[in-house]
Amino acid sequence: MPQLNPIPWVFLFFLVWLVLGFLGLQKFTSIVTTTLDDSSEEVEVKSKEYSWPW
């Protein structure tokens, strides 16, 4: 079995993890921003509809 050069494999390994981390972070930030936008809109709507709940 021939001896493989480890440098390209290490580079590809880190490149794949960098891409996966970037995509995961992008997905996570999009979910967080949508939930924050939804919650802020709900708070505004609730405060307008039910200003005095009792």
From Swiss-Prot:
Q: Which InterPro entries match?
A: ATP8_metazoa, ATPase_protein_8
Give UniProt keywords alphabetically.
ATP synthesis, CF(0), Hydrogen ion transport, Ion transport, Membrane, Mitochondrion, Transmembrane, Transmembrane helix, Transport
Taxonomic superkingdom: Eukaryota
Q: Where in the cell is it found?
A: Mitochondrion membrane
Q: Which GO terms describe its cellular component?
A: mitochondrial membrane; proton-transporting ATP synthase complex
Topology relative to the membrane: Single-pass membrane protein
What molecular function terms (GO) are annotated for this protein? proton transmembrane transporter activity
Can you tell me where the transmembrane regions are? 9-25
A Gene Ontology BP annotation from the UniProt entry: proton motive force-driven ATP synthesis
Say which family it is in: Belongs to the ATPase protein 8 family.
The record's function comment reads: Mitochondrial membrane ATP synthase (F(1)F(0) ATP synthase or Complex V) produces ATP from ADP in the presence of a proton gradient across the membrane which is generated by electron transport complexes of the respiratory chain. F-type ATPases consist of two structural domains, F(1) - containing the extramembraneous catalytic core and F(0) - containing the membrane proton channel, linked together by a central stalk and a peripheral stalk. During catalysis, ATP synthesis in the catalytic domain of F(1) is coupled via a rotary mechanism of the central stalk subunits to proton translocation.
PANTHER family assigned:
ATP SYNTHASE PROTEIN 8
How does the record describe its quaternary structure? F-type ATPases have 2 components, CF(1) - the catalytic core - and CF(0) - the membrane proton channel.
> What name does this protein carry?
ATP synthase protein 8
- This chain is encoded by the gene named MTATP8
